[in-house]
Amino acid sequence: MSKEKFERKKPHVNVGTIGHVDHGKTTLTAAITTVLAKTFGGNARAFDQIDNAPEEKARGITISTSHVEYDTPSRHYAHVDCPGHADYVKNMITGAAQMDGAILVVAATDGPMPQTREHILLGRQVGVPYIIVFLNKCDMVDDEELLELVEMEVRELLSQYDFPGDDTPVIRGSALKALEGDAEWEAKIIELAEALDSYIPEPERAIDQPFLLPIEDVFSISGRGTVVTGRVERGIVKVGEEVEIVGIKDTTKTTCTGVEMFRKLLDEGRAGENVGVLLRGTKRDEIERGQVLAKPGSIKPHTTFESEVYILSKDEGGRHTPFFKGYRPQFYFRTTDVTGTIELPEGVEMVMPGDNIQMKVTLIAPIAMDQGLRFAIREGGRTVGAGVVAKVIA
């Protein structure tokens, strides 16, 4: 089967469904693809095509995820749906499927349930910037007041986790009825699509963000100086610009005097490219793997942060035993391991393989970091967990 050429005409936005088990996330995913295909063109995906999600590996962790695509007149959406609760936790923490916004599915027949709360909290911790609510199964609730009550509960829950509950779009619909072709409920899916278009801003492209390059290797070239290599994570570096070297040691400034790719000289290096950057007046032993080159002032080194972490189960090749406070693993950021100590939340004595947990981490050396930075937890080179920086402390 030949792959279709990907058309880059429209802005591309990543979204996904979140919410409690059996509230209708997968049915809604199928309904969106079906109704939008019927209305604006594109491919419909049936419920069972989405439900038996293929397994994939992200950072050594097995996650089942379904990816579907759909279009509105103004945008192209890539949408993820996970079959099981554990898959959501892993997906959101590893960032395997980054979301520019999420559709929170809440069954009007049940109202908010434990996983509703947990997914909202995870969204807050891992930096999902926008949430839209789809109140599902509204065809099964005759009482208007009950719908009002459920909507109010969901809004309060969002506000509790620092999302703007009062301003969040809430669409009342029935994914199943829409999927069956009932025009009244199909209209609600179009309303949801319009909310996605208007409420989730177009994401800033990596190339428009401040320059950052994680350093993978450092070479000394006689007569020319020091070259660092790596893949530009975001932004652009131009020859002649000042850059900072951040992390592990004290931050220093230097100037980029050359950029090369595949032994060709360029005048700039752009997001996504593997490049060598020549630095003026910097000695080979002043730089090491694990530091980053960055636009001056755009990122700071930190040692202490709150994180949301998933600990691999034994079956995933993780630990066989729990760990306790005082645990000192390595934290792998971008290109290097740094040892750190952990503090567990109050009342938590131990962490079992397969758990997800909030923990405070203190590293023995500073790393250039912002909220949302992903990391792996390793013991002797073996991955035992995955995490994300939820909040920088110091």
From Swiss-Prot:
GO MF, one annotated term: translation elongation factor activity
Location in the cell: Cytoplasm
Record region (G4): 136-139
Annotated region (G2), positions in chain: 60-64
Keywords: Cytoplasm, Elongation factor, GTP-binding, Hydrolase, Magnesium, Metal-binding, Nucleotide-binding, Protein biosynthesis
Region annotated G1, chain positions: 19-26
GO cellular component: cytosol
Region (G3): 81-84
Residue ranges annotated for the tr-type G domain, each copy included: 10-204
Protein residues bound to Mg(2+): 26
Family: Belongs to the TRAFAC class translation factor GTPase superfamily. Classic translation factor GTPase family. EF-Tu/EF-1A subfamily.
Name of the featured protein: Elongation factor Tu 1
Species the sequence originates in: Photorhabdus laumondii subsp. laumondii (strain DSM 15139 / CIP 105565 / TT01)
Lineage of source species: Bacteria, Pseudomonadati, Pseudomonadota, Gammaproteobacteria, Enterobacterales
